[in-house]
Each structure stands twice: as C-alpha cells, then as structure tokens.
Amino acid sequence: FIIRKKYDLASQRRRFVESMVDGKLLSIGYAYLIDLVNKGHLSTFFTTNFDDLLQEAFYQFSAKRPIMCAHDSSVQSISITSTRPKIIKLHGDYLFDDIKSTLRETESLEQNIKEKLIQFCKEFGLIVIGYSGNDRSIMDVIEFLTKQDNYLSNGLYWCLREGDEVNSTLEKLLWRDRVYPIFVDGFDEFFAATHNGIVSGGLGIESNLNQPKIKKTVGFMMSDSHGLFKDKIIKKELDRLKSMDRQIEISNFITDISSDKDVSSSLPISDYRNLLEIGSFIAKKDFKKAKNLAEDDFNQSSSDTAKPQYLLKLISL
C-alpha cells in the first residue's frame, strides 16, 4: 500500500526496490544454505524476495550455477528432474519493471508459476522461512495443497520466530495435517543448525578467502553487525574462518618476502621476525598495534634492507 501510494509507475517502484537492495552483503546463513545445496540436500527455491542475494550466494560459494526464473513465460522450461539448482521468483525480480510490489499486484500469481509451485509440491516437501503469509495468491495455493492427499506428502515446515504476528489464514493453516510450525531464532541461525545437524565439518570456503569478493563478504560476517556471535554454531565457524584468514595473511606475507630473494636473504633474523609479528597483527585487524610496532621497529632497526620493508607496512596501514 505504501509503495503504491508513493510510486504510481511500475518503473518508479522498481527503482525504489533496487535502491533498497543495492549494496547488500551476504550473511552467513547464505553460506550454510549454499553448502547444503552443494552437498545435495536442497535444490529448489521459491522466493518472494526481489533482490539477487540468493543468486549472488551461488556465485560466491558454489561452482553450481542456478536456473533463475523471474518471468511467468520462462518457468515452463524448468524440469523437476533437473539436477541444477533452481530459483523461482514468485513476484518477479527488481531488475524488471513488472515486479509485484503492491498489495493488488501480489493478490494474483501468474498461472505458469502457480502450476510449477504445485508440481514441485507434489514431489517434495516445503520449508517456509522469512515469509509472513500475507500474499493471498500464494496462501491460496498452499491452502489448496494441504487439502490434497497426494501433495506435500513430505510435510510443510513453517519457520516462525518468537513474537511473530500470525495472521488468521496462517493460523488456520498451521492446524492442518502435515503442517509443522518450527520456532527459529532467525534465517542465519536456522541454516546454521540445519547444516550442523546434517553436514559434518565447517563451510569449506576458506580456500577462497583470497578472492576479494569473498574476503569482503567474510569480513562483513566477522563484523557481527547482526549480533550472530551469540549463536554457538555460528561463533565457532566465524572463529575458525578468522583463524584461517589470519593464517592466509601470514602465509601471503611470508610468500611476498620470500619471493624477493635479495630482500629475504639479506634481512637480519630479528627484523624478519619483527615483520612477521607486524603481519600477524595486521591479519588480526589490530592495525593500531601493527602501526605502533612498525614505527618502533623502524626506528630501532639498523638494516638498510629492513627499513624499506617497515615503511611498506606503514604505508599499507
């Protein structure tokens, strides 16, 4: 209602939604989700979101490339037996002007998309997370499916958070057979717990930490802007990634020094150790301590070979 009242034209609404999703970074829940796909536990996603975070997660954390459908005309070509991951946008994509962003628009679901949702629910169960059930078009389909014996035979699992407002339609739905309310702390915590229960070991993304985009994403995760460190599973994984990132930084530093034979062979052992110590503080993001140490070591060093190395560290800081 608010979007339609403020933006009359579909193109205006698209630009508004685009401005809201632009520059968003992936939270750790996406990494867990994609790893479940990589391990063969998930494959198909129906989403009401306009953003491209799910697609971006595949590009960062998987070698698999998903089939993405944001138009009614394109969804017919999706095969239920295809092994490729599938993303079907129920209300469109923000890149196109025909996104369904108003109440009137979301009251209807395109026929081909509706049929594809029904088709998949005949073969598979359904996990619903991050969705309030306020779109009549989608809820009508789900209500219909829960009344059919040969659909959702593997169950419908609806994730809720404590304190969520449950509308009357959803409340009635949760009382149906094969429909199970699941209380979760949030998107990230749910996929962390699911991953922990199904997959042994961590996320396995440390080998890509040298890639700038992944490094930026992991750095955002480690900033804990969403307060996820209180979750034991997530904290353990982020601590592990932080340790791996530190080891990679130190390894890169050693490689950089070792690659210059003239420098590495002529560095006094004390300066070599000092530079390693500075590198370790940089890896820990303790830039103040690294800077102070580099300045002190520069002033105390008597090596003409080492001094430029200290200056390079100071410049990088």
Description of each model-found segment:
Residues 50, 92, 131:
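Active-site metal-binding loops of divalent metal-dependent hydrolases
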